[in-house]
Regions:
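Accessory RNA-recognition modules of RNA-modification enzymes
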Residues: 1-166
Length: 166
């Protein structure tokens, strides 16, 4: 928990467009002189970047969580422009949360949140149901797998006699 692996390129696990540009985001904060969060010392500015993806719309919701220590000199407009440049129309929402909780895993609902651009949530669809996804949402990251699981569960629910399944 004390170290962070800097993402330099697409890991194949999430979103190539965003992952390939992570060095640009890191450079933005480094050039501005913003410090990274030091979990052991409970100090620093940049805590984490939470990203949610709607596979239905191919859009992203980005929430930057920082401490309040350097917030007065944080260039919100510059960060917003950078994220728009990186994601274009795929950026559905950009949020900035200031959280000074010294804990290792601060609750993202604590602190103050500002919408820098767009909306504070995404919409995702699974089996025709629509879900509102916020930065705090625990949601299946692979909707296609979730649809298969839901469909299988519904098959079991609507079987007349579960005992006769081959």
């Amino acid at each position: 928990w004390l170290s962070v692996e800097p993402m330099q390129k697409d890991s194949g696990l999430f979103d190539k467009q965003l992952e390939d540009r992570m060095p640009d985001i890191q450079r933005f904060f480094s050039e501005a002189g913003h410090s990274g969060w030091h979990a052991k010392k409970h100090s620093g500015f940049c805590r984490f970047l939470t990203v949610k993806k709607s596979f239905r719309d191919d859009t992203l919701l980005v929430n930057l969580t920082t401490s309040g220590s350097e917030v007065k000199r944080f260039d919100k407009a510059g960060f917003t422009a950078l994220m728009q440049n990186i994601l274009g129309n795929r950026l559905a929402g950009l949020l900035h949360t200031v959280n000074d909780d010294p804990g290792d895993r601060p609750n993202t609902t604590d602190g103050t949140r500002e919408i820098l651009l767009g909306k504070p949530e995404l919409i995702e669809s699974i089996c025709g149901l629509k879900f509102r996804i916020s930065p705090e949402s625990f949601f299946q990251t692979n909707p296609q797998s979730a649809e298969r699981l839901y469909t299988k569960a519904l098959d079991y629910v609507f079987e007349k006699d579960l005992g006769e399944k081959p």
